[in-house]
Amino acid sequence: MVYSWFCVDHVGYESNPRNRELGFHKIFDRYVELKNSKKSSSDGIHFHYHPMPFSRSAHHCATKYFGSSDTLYQSLARKIIDRSWFPCAFRPGFNAIRPDSHWFLEQFIPFDFSNQAHISDTDLAPDLSSGRFGDWRRAQKNWQPYHPDHNDYQLQGNCKRLIMRCLNIGTRHRLLTQTDVDQAFLEAESKKPVVLSFTHHDFRDMRPDIELVRKMLINAKEKFPKVRFKYSEARNAVREALAINYEPAIKLNLNIRENKLFVDSSVPTFGPQPFLAIKTNN
């Protein structure tokens, strides 16, 4: 199988009772090292972000991206400056997108694995009901990527980025089932562009749950023998499903003229403005 590692920076917290790995690049560097090994060379490295809770505790959840901290900008800016890296794919912390994160992603990141629309949303525990952590009640419950609406990320619209459905394994809600996998194969049999994706967390032993998914794929393949599928990392999965052409690498030219910074691009950029990172002397 091929894996996509969505790496988070645990930074800016005042308490860390569960001893999470703190610091910029700590998790990112670990998985880059693994990817560079022969066994994981086909894996993908992508971006994950946990909004800062009011408590500033590393084990608490939050959904608001701006106002409580600048860790989102810090994390991305340091990836550019320290690692010469910027993401093209994203999965949101706590599966939650809101208008603030929706419009931020629309400027900079084209592939968004956040849609968790699921039949079980009508029967969630009280702490997860009413879209508390990830409101996907109006979103499409199929496996085709979609462009969201400007004012409602759950509906199809004319935004540039693509949102993919990505269900859970190994947890207590929005679980990927055999029915979901069969649905993906049925859609593929109907010649629809399908990206079947699921998510887990590396602080657990993921192997039993991933083996369960593999068995579900085998079962679906027996039901739909004409459907071909392949394991793929996140970026390539979207590109291949939608037949998105590979573009040449962007080349930027920076100049300072009359105390003004000018940035020229060799190709059109994804969003309306570039993400500019600056490192100061202090």
Model-derived features: where do they sit?
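The substrate-binding groove and active-site-proximal loops of carbohydrate-active enzymes
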Residues: V11-F24, S57-G67, F86-G93, I169-R172, ...
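Active-site beta->alpha N-cap acidic-glycine motif
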Residues: M1-K38
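Secondary-structure boundary elements
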Residues: K38-S41, Y65-P87, I97-D100, Q107-N115, ...
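Acidic, His- and aromatic-enriched active-site or binding-groove loops in soluble protein domains
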Residues: K26-K38, G44, S68-L72, L76, ...
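Active-site-adjacent pocket scaffolds in enzyme catalytic domains
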Residues: I81-W85, R91-K192
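Hydrophobic faces of well-ordered beta-strands that scaffold small-molecule active sites
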Residues: Y3-W5, D43-Y49, C88-P92, F113-N115, ...
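C-terminal beta-sandwich/jelly-roll accessory domains of carbohydrate-active enzymes
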Residues: I244-N282
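C-terminal domain-boundary segment and adjacent tail
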Residues: F113-S114, D180-A184, S190-K260
